[in-house]
């Protein structure tokens, strides 16, 4: 009987330790990334197929801050605030103008409306020239968005 109590106590303690570790990672990792990448939103989930094949729906991407238009180049994948519907959009830069830039999703046929430089939140972190992403890590966000928009 005493042995069984010890096993139960050990199980409960291990459970709480794991919860604390997972909670620390869940809360701490985004804060650490926000600080190190100089951006309030260091991660984003791809919620549509507009950036296929570079980014797939459900991918989690890492975003780094930009200081201004001098940090942006044609071909960069950026995150910008879409003021029409108060959402964020992740598309590739196709033109750089004096006061605004133009983007387009890789899978889209037409360009987006011009984006003011002050609406650019950041650009995707790249590794060996490719966007840093975790495939399917954002599937919960995609699922929740689809359920909310039904």
Located regions from the model:
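Short catalytic-loop micro-motif centered on adjacent basic/acidic residues
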Residues: 62, 79-80
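Short, charged beta-turn/beta-strand-edge "cap" motif at the junction between a beta-strand
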Residues: 66-71, 84-87
């Amino acid at each position: 009987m005493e042995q069984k109590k010890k096993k139960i106590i050990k199980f409960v303690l291990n459970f709480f330790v794991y919860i604390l570790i997972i909670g620390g990672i869940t809360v701490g990792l985004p804060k650490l990334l926000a600080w190190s990448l100089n951006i309030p939103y260091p991660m984003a989930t791809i919620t549509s197929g507009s950036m296929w094949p570079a980014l797939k729906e459900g991918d989690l991407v890492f975003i780094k801050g930009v200081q201004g238009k001098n940090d942006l180049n044609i071909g960069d994948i950026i995150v910008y605030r879409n003021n029409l519907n108060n959402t964020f959009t992740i598309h590739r830069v196709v033109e750089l103008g004096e006061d605004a830039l133009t983007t387009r999703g890789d899978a889209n046929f037409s360009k987006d409306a011009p984006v003011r430089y002050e609406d650019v939140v950041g650009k995707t972190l790249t590794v060996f020239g490719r966007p840093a992403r975790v495939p399917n890590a954002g599937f919960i966000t995609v699922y929740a968005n689809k359920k909310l928009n039904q």
